[in-house]
């Protein structure tokens, strides 16, 4: 596995990248992440007005940027990008509505719960317990299974949410996604066939594909220029904790401690995926510092007035495609997010890129993540028990992404949170099965 990963990387995590190139490649990660989607969904769930929705979006960009830079430079010290998860959205809306709504004490109660949960994560990292948990519970075969399930769980989102069920004519959606994906594949093929232009076409493949897809969508009348024109050039985030205030409610706090536990499981899968694509064995120090960085990122998000920002697995797929894993690129991505937090017109431009264009690239990214997980598993000496450790989590991942919404909605609230995170269910299943089966010796941490 090491040779394969090394040969696929053009630029390693600690390799320097010129500022201009890092800026462009950082934007490539930003475009692939769809960070604006969860806050837009949450704003709709809470019936926010235009001002509140814009404020939530700006706060999310700002928190994602600060969190990304914190993790990459000071804590995890790996190419890691932070962004909002879909998992807490239902709980967040529920807490707000149960506490008086937006005009009552709702947001203050939500932010109070988020602050306490974030502090718990920081304390977990400071205690050194997180690394011990990983060493004890997550050998290589479990880690590879989690990575595989991370990629697998994202495929339906790439296809359904961004293409088949996205706004617009479904045939146009498929056409846009196909053109974008084909452009990406052509760029990668050119980089392999003609090594002299590898740097341009491999490292810039996603930006080129998104640019082509956006131009085609504009020719179809699918690009929303009005939303861009109506947006202000510059504005400070207005909906922070200073605006909403803070309040503490025990039930809400306990709810979000559970949510944070689920998010931590997802983030662990993201770090495994990033370690696999960069051929880096995550150290004990990185595990503990990473969870401290995760907690501080979520604390920043709460102070900014938005939901937790956690590790994004999409970026591992981007690295697999582009071959660039430089931390400077991720610092640039974090800087882009901060810029987007203040420049509403630029945010509106990126948000106006049609979902099928994003989906065409996203679908390929998810597959590369899944294959990296399978590659980790392939390197292990597996026996009969491993068939169940690997297979059952994959089955459950597929089952949960295909589970009808009416079944999920009928479940108790806490179970709904778990059902909303196939990665967490897969990880817990793999860990439990591994404990029940004969012990493995290959550790990832």
Question: Where are the predicted features?
Answer:
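Intrinsically disordered, low-complexity non-transmembrane regions of multi-pass membrane transporters
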Residues: 1-23, 225-241, 432-445
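Short, non-helical or kinked segments that cap or interrupt transmembrane helices
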Residues: 76-89, 134-143, 200-207, 285, ...
